[in-house]
């Protein structure tokens, strides 16, 4: 038994123990540790999934936010559930925990800050801020660093999906793709395109490619870059953004065509919660024997 307990830290395995007339199946699971950078609403969904037992093969060991109170709130919830979670005040402190995975739910700027150091640290990344990967030079650096260090960067689907069919259609050749996003005018406040007239009239506020879109809306259209990286690339992905008075939530519609396939992935979400749950799904896929 002592030998088995020692081996349990190396890999998951099961064995049978007989006690009297009863037999018990004992399973040791190799737990993965992860940390979160960015402690807003989406990070809260992921941490609550841990608390509710939806991620049984994971241990959340640390959280980091530029607003320390937000990190403390998540760590406090973990403590209430009897789970230890460190509040980190710097990126170096977070990576010093040597997590298997870094979950990034902050911003493209945060991904730029964390990606290369994390991958060199032996830490794979699950990210929602895919907009940072529109930059080809940064994208290549991330890919090369991951290869050199045996790590990976997992792109969560966020508020869209269908990356498998997008990639498949693109691999077949001669593919074109376009992305359509509809949102309410309030969601555009603070951006260069916002004007009060949008509160009363429907208007296309942007047309261009995914690189131009993420440059103009650095936190609003990460999904366009994700869909483009799964298919035709950020320069070739054509993007249209429409503002509709009174519209709540987001419609994300990506369309891809080649000589044989025409596919449309159309997702409406009233809130951003689907993005947080897409991280939970990605984490499950990483450890699942069956991957969707």
Regions found by a protein language model. Name each.
Residues 121-123, 148-151:
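A short helix->loop->beta-strand "cap" motif at the edges of active sites that frequently abuts
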């Amino acid at each position: 038994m002592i030998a088995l307990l020692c081996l349990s830290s190396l890999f998951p395995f099961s064995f049978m123990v007989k006690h009297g007339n009863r037999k018990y199946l004992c399973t040791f699971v190799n737990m993965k540790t992860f940390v979160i950078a960015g402690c807003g609403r989406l990070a809260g969904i992921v941490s609550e999934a841990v608390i509710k037992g939806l991620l049984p093969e994971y241990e959340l060991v640390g959280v980091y936010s530029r607003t320390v109170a937000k990190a403390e709130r998540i760590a406090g919830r973990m403590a209430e559930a009897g789970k230890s979670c460190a509040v980190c005040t710097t990126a170096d402190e977070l990576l010093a925990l040597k997590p298997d995975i870094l979950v990034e739910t902050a911003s493209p700027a945060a991904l730029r800050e964390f990606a290369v150091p994390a991958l060199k640290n032996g830490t794979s990344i699950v990210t929602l801020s895919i907009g940072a990967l529109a930059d080809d030079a940064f994208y290549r650096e991330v890919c090369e660093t991951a290869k050199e260090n045996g790590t990976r960067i997992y792109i969560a689907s966020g508020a869209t999906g269908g990356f498998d069919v997008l990639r498949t259609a693109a691999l077949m050749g001669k593919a074109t793709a376009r992305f359509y996003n509809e949102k309410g005018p309030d969601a555009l406040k603070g951006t260069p395109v916002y004007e009060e007239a949008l509160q009363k009239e429907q208007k296309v506020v942007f047309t261009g490619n995914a690189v131009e879109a993420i440059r103009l809306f650095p936190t609003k259209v990460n999904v366009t870059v994700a869909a483009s990286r799964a298919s035709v690339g950020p320069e070739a992905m054509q993007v249209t953004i429409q503002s509709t008075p009174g519209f709540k939530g987001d419609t994300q519609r990506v369309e891809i065509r080649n000589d044989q396939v025409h596919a449309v992935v159309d997702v409406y979400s009233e809130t951003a919660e689907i993005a947080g749950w897409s991280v939970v799904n990605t984490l499950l896929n990483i450890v699942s024997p069956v991957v969707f």
